[in-house]
Amino acid sequence: MPMFAFGQKQDRVERMLRKMSVRDKVGQLFIINYGHYTPEGQIEEMIKKDRIGGLIIMEDEMVHYANRMNALQKQSRIPMVISIDGEWGASMRFDTLTQFPRNMQLGALSNTDMIYKVGRAMADQFRRVGVHINYAPTVDVNNNPKNPVIGQRSFGDNPQKVAKYGAALIRGMQDGGVWTSAKHFPGHGDTDVDSHKALPTLPFDRARLDAMELYPFQEAINQDVWMVMVGHLNVPALDPTGMPSSLSYPIITKLLKEEMGFKGIVVTDALGMKGVSTYMPAEMVPLASFKAGSDVLLMPAQSWHRSIKNVIKAVKKGEISRERLDESVRKVLKMKEQLGLLDGTPFIDPENIYEDTETKEVVDLIQEVCDASVTMVKRPSVALKGEGSLNELIKSGRAKEVVLDKRMSLASLDGAKASVAGAEYAVVYLPELRAPKNDFNSYSNMKPEEIYGFLSDWAGQQKVILAIMNNPYVLDQIDLKAFDGIVIGYSSVDQNMKAVGKVLSGEIDAEGVLPVSAGGLPNGFSAK
């Protein structure tokens, strides 16, 4: 369905607009964070006093969440839109669910058919749990291996591929009835600063930005993405004042809306992030972003009431025209109309919610993606199928397998090496070294470079087949020539461990390709 193509029902939205006060309208622009930790009564107060437009779900248990949403929606005169940052599906906020692969693993797939299916399956899950908006996918081009915040959230380092794969995921989710948001405009891939902590700078000229950062966003717009999320970035070529992109009129209104032709909803990245919240008093940030052209103001810093009041005051004082306010509120109401939220109070059935969401079809699809994305970087000297295969050697004891502990120490690595000593081949599974907050040292008593050095030395003493259950950038840190074989499984979840096991046992072939250039190997490489 084309964005905002809702037949004759627009009359209802116009009637609502005419009846709404400035306070009613401004409240619809704000989406506030909710989690199991949210104090009782806090959201109720914001619904009653500030008339907020929606919530973003952080973390909760599914049945508790469903009951809370049902109770809260009953109190909202205009039903709230429920949103989520669910880049790898509902499991990102409801951790009892099986996790969909991250975008970089999807980027290892050879075509987009399966990516569309992933989008549809994600949408089915979101709709079952009453989520209307997913702030995904990331269409940033991750062409900087040192990027601390995007990494596996990107489809890769090729803008054309990122655009193509992002469009497939968007199509799948939107066809499934869920609003999606291409992010982080104008592009967060080639940065070495996390915008949660500071303001990153993109120092490139306009020609480079058009060819790399902006390309996937333009393609998403051409493919009718319904929402674009603006990130917190300093882009001098687009706005020489140094204003963060989320507060920049030249970037949001002149570039995104006018030049690139985006007619949908512009949503901010979280406005409490330090990439923007330290730029001015926190309660002034939402107002500045709205003046710049944003439509929906996501997760302002804790001064929620003051933030909303400041926008109301600006409208009443004439700093913001009533027409400008109506323009954004109209978009929000039309979105709610398309979602059926204006037809009555929504209800999330808590009964069998887990069983309905974690279906066999979803689990099978996730395994199918994991199987299809395994990437052979260096084919082992031993055959993977037939007589004398690696699987036969493992059964006879001539080859042994070991899974390294995430909380690695020199002692644990020495122990792992000793456990396979004497074997002709050692199959070593290297887990993710990524901690929840991107603190690479949290899982280990050793620095990553020490771990990679140990493994490279080990490979010089024994035929080591390395299964990298992490992103491909590990290839930049190891001596590829030292290893007898290298395969990439992208993460340590059970489905990926199983998929790599299938490849090494000869049950399936490795069909994935490198989604990024790494280890001196090009994007799209696979060892056939």
Language model features: what each stretch is:
Residues 21, 55, 63-80, 84, ...:
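Second-shell residues forming the walls of enzyme active-site clefts
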Residues 46-60, 145-146, 221-242, 270, ...:
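Short acidic, glycine-rich surface-loop motifs adjacent to enzyme active sites
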